[in-house]
Design a protein with these regions (language model features):
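Short, small-residue-biased leader/transition segments that mark boundaries at the very start
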Residues: 1-5
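Amphipathic alpha-helical binding modules
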Residues: 69-99
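Membrane-proximal topogenic or attachment-prone low-complexity segments at protein termini
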Residues: 6-69
Length: 101
């Protein structure tokens, strides 16, 4: 039941994101989904900074097309959103692994 509340809370908070963040969100979630597999660097104890930057760059390359003045601010937003999402997924991954083992 706690997991349901966590998910509802998270979904609500995403629903009140500013417009720019809402436009970035699908690209960020798609990239995180793509990286979510056993052995992925996103589950490493200390994910490689270069790989994280490359991941964010792939998101930026898609998201910048929708912005009038993309730039460093957009990359900063993408990095913050992506790292937050990775933290959430890493916690979920650990909790699932605890239940299995």
């Amino acid at each position: 039941l706690g997991d349901v509340y966590k998910r509802q809370d998270y979904d609500y908070m995403k629903s009140i994101y500013p417009d720019t963040a809402k436009r970035v969100l699908p690209y960020m979630e798609e990239e995180c989904d793509r990286m979510e597999y056993d052995g992925s660097m996103m589950y490493d104890e200390y994910p490689d900074r270069l790989q994280l930057r490359l991941m964010c760059r792939r998101i930026y390359d898609k998201a910048e097309k929708e912005e009038e003045n993309p730039g460093a601010w957009l990359m900063d937003l993408i990095e913050v959103m992506t790292y937050q999402e990775l933290c959430r997924r890493r916690v979920e991954h650990r909790e699932i692994r605890k239940k299995i083992y």
